[in-house]
Amino acid sequence: MKFTEFGEYFRILRIKHKEVLKDASSFLGVSCAFISSVECGKKTIPEEWFDKLVDHYGLNEIQQNELRGAIDRSAKTVKLNIEYVTPTQKDLAVQFQRSFDELDEETANEILEILKRNA
């Protein structure tokens, strides 16, 4: 069974805290089968899990960043709310979406560096 980066991170958290899947099922309020599907990338990671995992495991800032990164890198889709943005920001989002599949690695890295500078 292949796990997503999030799945691996979550399993390590459970092991470090001597918990099994059933324990996570209880505090997340979902079935063990659902958690397993999320860990393997068959189901989307529910947004509320980040806060639940941070609270349950008492994650520090570094661990929170690691968890957020694992969640982000495990996502299959990304949604943007462009309801309250400027027309230029909206054009940027739409153009990025249209061009994304054709971006080469060098251009993607350049865009990433620009965005990191402005974050």
Task: Identify the role of each PLM range.
Residues 1-16, 106:
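A short, Lys/Arg-rich alpha-helix, primarily the initiator
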Residues 65-101:
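Short, charged recognition helix plus adjacent turn
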Residues 11, 22, 51:
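Residues within the helices of the helix-turn-helix
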Residues 18-36, 67:
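Short alpha-helical DNA-recognition segment
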Residues 48-66, 73:
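DNA major-groove recognition helix of helix-turn-helix/homeodomain DNA-binding modules
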Residues 14, 25, 54:
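The alpha-helix within a helix-turn-helix
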Residues 10, 38-39, 49, 57:
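DNA major-groove recognition helix of helix-turn-helix
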Residues 28-45, 52:
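Recognition helix of helix-turn-helix/homeodomain-like DNA-binding domains
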